[in-house]
Amino acid sequence: MPSATYGDLFPLTTPFAGQQNAYLDGLLTLTFDDAPTLGTSGEVRIYKQSDDSIVDVISMGGDIDALGYHGQDKLRHVNYLPIKVEGNQLIVKPHNNVLEYGESYYVAISDGLVTDASLNSQLFNGLGKTANWTFTTREAAPTGTHLLVDDDGEADFRSLQGALNYVMENLPKDQPATITLRDGEYEELLFLRNQNNVTIQGESRDNTLVYYANYDSLNSGSGD
């Protein structure tokens, strides 16, 4: 595991370093001093802080995710592209349902995942436990039948799939449920099963965007 340190990471990460109420379904982001270049191989790992056990390994290039809630009788298995760079920011989408409520974690990034990058004015050589990108998730799941999703503001979930998982796991199939999406961009593949009365409404027609660059050679049909 990389041992380099980069000073105070607080303003540079999502969840921010030391955050105590992180979402289970949010993205990981790391903002560099300038635009990095993705390498040809490497991983991002999430570890449980209490015992250093690995809870997620996110690989460069294509990966497979299982959409749905933990223990569901049928999941949707999809290929997806979990790591990208936009401007100065490395953006990582962890796998579905790997984090738990009320747990503390830390993030590690292998050396070579990005190249030609500096972080807090230091050459980036990977990131491990000593860099202190730690966070603790929220204590408990939301309750009720009206759920709010926002990609950057206070809400019940960060992703639409997170809200759909909650509905599938906790509500009877004919129970009315409403998911409201605040304006933002939600780049995600989706799965909903055995629910007959779910309303998904965006804050506005023009600024609430749900999309993914899906195509037949990436995921044929609807997934397995």
Protein language model features and the residues they cover:
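Folded extracytoplasmic luminal domains of secretory or organellar precursors
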Residues: D156-R158, Y186, L190-Q195, S220-D224
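Acidic helix-start/capping segments at beta-turn-to-alpha-helix junctions
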Residues: Q49, R182-D183
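Right-handed parallel beta-helix/beta-spiral solenoid domain characteristic of secreted/periplasmic
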Residues: D152-G153, N197-D224
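Acidic, low-complexity Ser/Thr/Gly/Pro-rich repeat segments typical of extracellular/periplasmic
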Residues: P2-A141
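The right-handed parallel beta-helix/beta-solenoid scaffold, focusing on the short coil/turn
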Residues: T145, A177, E188, N196-V198, ...
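Acidic Gly/Asp/Thr-rich repetitive segments characteristic of extracellular carbohydrate-active
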Residues: T145-T180
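Feature marks extracellular polysaccharide-active and adherence modules
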Residues: R182, R193, Q201-E203
